[in-house]
Amino acid sequence: VGALDNGWIGNQTLSDIAAKLGADCWPLNVELYGQPCIIARDIEPVNMSGPLPTNAISGSFSWQGQPCSILVRGGKVVRDWSCHYPRPESVLYKTTDGAVRIARVSSAAALGGVVWAVGGLGLLDRYDPAAEGFTGAYSDVLRKTNHTVLGYKGGMLYGVYCKAMTAQQVNAFVRDKLKLEYAVMLDGGHVAAIHAAVSRINTNQRQYYA
């Protein structure tokens, strides 16, 4: 078990232990290295008109109130195409047999049958903004601001609110600190939001994932 220099065991280690032991404490709202986070066994993508529900973060890229990244909910396609189609984007998704995976595709159809899918900007070994169309005017997404991340590690889903970071810093954070297996960065700036038991930031946002 890892510990801090003062002997304390941090939230990262404690939440990892809880996941491995099968603890019944999810969804769990914790701060990991100072960043608000929701850890859960599963997610349900939603696109509602009311205030942000409990245990939710703001979602992926949208335009005029509608999602413009790949989005599948309950096996039904909400948005079929990538944000910068025909350029592909990274998509975190759950298969019908319960596996969580990631792929870089241009359409939801390329994933086959899935329970849910959330497109975004690929992180970790998939971090390549130019390959996913985030160049020119669209590179504004990479600026230093608040961002949200959807990630996966050890059977758990992570919804993370990253405060005042560039996309490169977000990528380094989820790689070096959270040590996620898969992750996509979602929309940021004025739309970044989290609503959890303790963490409540910008909860009036309307496009999000629970």
Question: Could you describe each region identified by the protein language model?
Answer:
Residues 15-20, 31, 49-51, 74-76, ...:
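Polar/charged alpha-helical tracts
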Residues 42-44, 61, 94-97, 153-155, ...:
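Short, flexible beta-strand-to-coil junctions
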Residues 65-86, 135-210:
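Conserved, well-ordered active-site substructure
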Residues 3-4, 60-137:
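Active-site-adjacent helix-turn-beta-strand microarchitecture at beta-sheet edges
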Residues 1-2, 26-31, 38, 90-94, ...:
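Short beta-strand scaffold segments in enzyme catalytic cores
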Residues 1, 34-39, 97-106, 155-162, ...:
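Short, well-ordered strand-loop elements centered on a beta-strand within folded domains, enriched
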Residues 54-55, 90, 100, 121, ...:
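A broad, low-specificity signal marking well-ordered, structured residues that form hydrophobic/aromatic
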Residues 1-85, 101, 159-160:
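Zymogen propeptides
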